[in-house]
Regions:
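Juxtamembrane intracellular "pre-TM" segments in multi-pass secondary transporters
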Residues: 44-75, 254-255
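C-terminal membrane-cytosol helix-exit motif in multi-pass small-molecule transporters
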Residues: 24, 29-50, 235-240
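Small-residue (Gly/Pro/Ala) motifs that create kinks and tight helix-helix packing interfaces
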Residues: 4-16, 90, 204-213
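Intracellular juxtamembrane helix-capping segments at the cytosolic ends
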Residues: 169-182
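A membrane-interface helix-boundary motif in multi-pass transporters
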Residues: 16-30, 211-228
Length: 255
């Protein structure tokens, strides 16, 4: 998923440079149709019964679990912050006349994301999530600030690498903690909650930041995103203080 969020915008940015917007929409349609076709051949596992033999609840309320909600909220704020990058990088780069640098931003993001994910999972499993989460939140914050105040191609590429390290490395840890916070028969609910939080953060973040662009400009939406990352870190710290040490599902399994 992380690479898809990079490859798609990278292709879109390069098509935008040639004003191939119609072709871009047709490409998105083709990929969506391919996804639907592939989903038809996926085998869905049967509903797992609880230990007492009862079936899990289905419906809207089954999408939430109180134990997992705090970590989902942190994930929401993280993705909300990243929405400004995903939705407005091309427009921001065009305003700065840095369209080529925007493509390189995404390449740097992908490269550093793949490099860091090779070892951050092991660090989380051996030492604990805080040794990954707090440094990554700091790096993500710096990356957003660097992007907001960029004045050239080099700074934009550096910000891409920093955001790849920060946002790209910390999201699997949050997924691990959401799953680890619930009972085994609720792992599916927790996993669904994680992705719902990401989708909501991306959609609501793009909508709200889109309304902010005209009054404050693109630079300030990235500064606002950095503030939200700090808020997410504070919420995470409070939650970890309440829970203390908690056993984790192996993070490497989620990478």
């Amino acid at each position: 998923m992380g690479l898809a969020m990079v490859v798609g915008p990278w292709i879109g940015l390069n098509m935008a440079r040639w004003n191939a917007f119609t072709a871009a929409f047709w490409l998105c349609t083709a990929v969506a149709v391919l996804g639907i076709v592939l989903s038809l051949i996926v085998t869905v596992p049967p509903v797992i019964h609880h230990a007492d033999g009862s079936r899990p609840n289905l419906g809207f309320t089954a999408m939430f679990d109180r134990a997992a909600l705090p970590f989902a909220l942190v994930t929401f704020f993280m993705t909300f912050s990243y929405a400004g990058v995903s939705a407005f990088l091309a427009l921001y780069a065009r305003e700065l006349d840095l369209m080529a640098a925007a493509s390189n931003f995404l390449l740097c993001y992908a490269i550093f994301l793949m490099i860091c994910r090779t070892f951050t999972g092991n660090i989380c499993d051996k030492k604990g999530p805080k040794y990954v989460v707090y440094p990554c939140l700091l790096v993500f914050t710096i990356g957003l600030l660097a992007l907001g105040y960029t004045n050239g191609s080099i700074i934009m590429m550096i910000s891409g690498g920093l955001i790849g390290i920060g946002y790209g490395s910390v999201t699997p840890v949050f997924q691990t903690q959401i799953i680890s916070s619930v009972e085994p028969h609720k792992i599916g609910v927790a996993n669904s909650l994680f992705f719902n939080a990401m989708d909501a953060g991306m959609a609501i973040g793009a909508f709200i930041m889109g309304m902010m662009v005209e009054p404050v400009g693109y630079r300030m939406i990235y500064v606002a995103g950095a503030v939200l990352v700090i808020l997410a870190g504070a919420l995470y710290a409070v939650q970890m203080k309440k829970r203390g040490a908690m056993p984790l599902v192996s993070t490497s399994e989620l990478h």
